[in-house]
Amino acid sequence: MTMLNGLRILDTLPLAALEVGKHWYWEIGNLKLHGQVFMASWVVIALLIIASLLATRNIQRVPSGMQNFMEYVLEFLRDLARTQLGEKHYRPWLPFIGTLFLFIFVSNWSGSLIPWRLIEIPEGELAAPTNDINTTVALALLTSLAYFYAGLSKKGLGYFANYVQPIPVLLPIKILEDFTKPLSLSFRLFGNILADELVVAVLVFLVPLFVPLPLMALGLFTSAIQALVFATLAGAYIHEAIESEEEEEHA
């Protein structure tokens, strides 16, 4: 009886609720678009454009301030692309890999540094763009299109010969691999960012002052790592598509 009375008392207490998965849809004809994802993505793109304009508005021979920081970022991205693609192939793909990294990095950090939930919208709530599976799948599909394009532009139709090398029995496995690559990229990024934001949101709700701060710092670190992993794997997949047999033997 004592236990039953205790359960009845618990039933009368208000429960904390944290809703996820609600979306504000924009209807364009027969299409339904996730409005809050577009809004958050535009904010991230605007931040990147503003940073670029600030860094290039007064270019100096001896860089300082914002220009110095942006040159460091560009040097980091160049080294990242060159490491994955090699000296011979990295230049045409540097803009793609650099854009991937910067968009994902700023999106991930915006989830911790921008108070999205304070901005009211008709339905759902704003969050980091990479907190939505649609964004991460779109980025992964872009990566898939990039390495297919890289392989076809480098080898022509001979690119498809890779599917039956070294033995034809590997054909089903290599076709399956083309589906698992974007899936693994998208779900890894989505799962890490969503989990980080949910943990911080719950702790802020329960203990709203100092306890969430270390987790927020850890979240910033893991968010940067996720951006690096995504860009690194994208470069590795593109290099795999364009690498010739002679280069493999030389390596």
Swiss-Prot record:
The reply on keyword DNA damage is: no
What main location does UniProt list? membrane
Q: Which InterPro entries match?
A: ATP_syn_F0_a_bact/chloroplast, ATP_synth_F0_asu, ATP_synth_F0_asu_AS, F0_ATP_A_sf
| Alphabetized GO MF terms | proton-transporting ATP synthase activity, rotational mechanism
Keyword entries, A-Z: ATP synthesis, CF(0), Hydrogen ion transport, Ion transport, Membrane, Thylakoid, Transmembrane, Transmembrane helix, Transport
Report membrane topology.
Multi-pass membrane protein
TM regions (residue ranges): 35-55, 94-114, 133-153, 198-218, 219-239
For this record, an example GO cellular component is: plasma membrane-derived thylakoid membrane
What Pfam families does the database record attribute to this sequence?
A: ATP-synt_A
Compartments, record wording:
Cellular thylakoid membrane
Q: Which family, according to UniProt?
A: Belongs to the ATPase A chain family.
Q: Note the HAMAP family from the entry.
A: ATP_synth_a_bact
- NCBIfam families xref list: ATP_synt_6_or_A
Record's function text: Key component of the proton channel; it plays a direct role in the translocation of protons across the membrane.
In Swiss-Prot or TrEMBL terms, this protein is called ATP synthase subunit a 2
Organism name:
Crocosphaera subtropica (strain ATCC 51142 / BH68) (Cyanothece sp. (strain ATCC 51142))
- Gene that encodes the chain: atpB2
